[in-house]
Amino acid sequence: MNITGIITEYNPLHKGHIYHINKTKELTSCDGIVCIMSGNFVQRGIPAIMDKWTRCELALNSGVDLVIELPSVYSLSSAEFFAYGSISLLNSIGIINNICFGSESGNIDDIKSIAKILNNEPSEFKNHLKDYLDKGVSYPVARSKALVEYFNDNLETQEILKSSNNILGIEYCKSLLKLKSTIIPYTIQRKGSNYNDDKLESKFSSATAIRSHVKNSKNINILKDILPSKTFNYLYDKFNNNNLVFEDSMFSFIKYKSLTLKNKLENLPDVKEGLHNKIYSELKNSNSFYELVSNIKSKRYAYTRISRILCQYFIGMENFNLEYLRTKKSPYGRVLGFNDTGRKILKEMKKKSSIPIYMKLPKTLNDTLKLDIQSTYAYSMINKSVSYDSDFKTSPIYLK
């Protein structure tokens, strides 16, 4: 079988995602699609608007054949570790021929050439990177500027490095090189809104714009013509039953934890240079998640980095060796759902995978899996439709 992997969050699944699925099938001529999907928390450092089982079902109804959960140790990390965890998982299951991702560029050769520089790190690039870091800018900004210098201020490189999905695509390709993978990368140019756009568009609205509208509106009927019907129906039902969650859902718990439990925020690997003191200080004076992050962010610490730190703290990741875990290849593949084609893929995967494939949780839990379970515990505190023990009780979805 010719199998293509895609890496997703579906927060929530929209028409742009369906376009990606259909174009992936067309571009790679694949017999099936395996989707690596973030669980209940996503890379921006926020809880998913709908739980992972609901989003898995939507994916299966939209043309995906098999959904595997991306462990939270990767899904709540920077683009580099998010990509590495995802690619290592696709590589380890042993049956993936291609990956296909969306990008603003749409040019796989440009993306691969930048990935090669980041993987090899020639001395000229490293010197530029050090110079910018010494000026106090954040690592992502310093890296982008160093790349532009390396490519002699190439305007095309500057444009590529401005966009979130291009950066993720570069990290995917870099991880393929790092792992010496035989998986072939493809990219599809994104249509409609950019990843960070917060305004609705009639055809391809971004997930950011959709979440923003749902969060700030009393009526979401306008989304009926923008979203796939199944996504809208799920959202509408959960909206009316107050079962949707946003970053502010975590705020009171984070504030209480910081004031009473005194867990060590500084144990998280992205908390450096006394940042924990700034966070503790601003927590006392902030009244919302957005206000808190806005008060902390700086030239050195981007909004999403602060958001991820707070989300990790909410879950309790400071009690694990996150710095070690996120640099290692994914140690297992946990199946969330599949259809008939996915069933055939699973059969092949179990023969060829170099890591265990879990349909249900094993008796012995490694730290990466413990963190996934702890993430569900935390998510159940802010989403009343999710049971704290759902990881133990929920079987993979089988869409016939």
Swiss-Prot record:
Keywords annotated in UniProt: ATP-binding, Cytoplasm, Ligase, Nucleotide-binding, RNA-binding, tRNA processing, tRNA-binding
InterPro entries: Rossmann-like_a/b/a_fold (IPR014729), tRNA(Met)_cyd_acetate_ligase (IPR008513)
SUPFAM superfamilies registered for this protein in UniProt: Nucleotidylyl transferase
Enzyme Commission designation: 6.3.4.-
GO biological process assignments: tRNA modification
Gene Ontology, cellular component aspect: cytoplasm
Matching NCBIfam families: PRK13670.1 (NF010191)
Function: Catalyzes the formation of N(4)-acetylcytidine (ac(4)C) at the wobble position of elongator tRNA(Met), using acetate and ATP as substrates. First activates an acetate ion to form acetyladenylate (Ac-AMP) and then transfers the acetyl group to tRNA to form ac(4)C34.
Protein name in the entry: tRNA(Met) cytidine acetate ligase
Organism, scientific name: Clostridium novyi (strain NT)
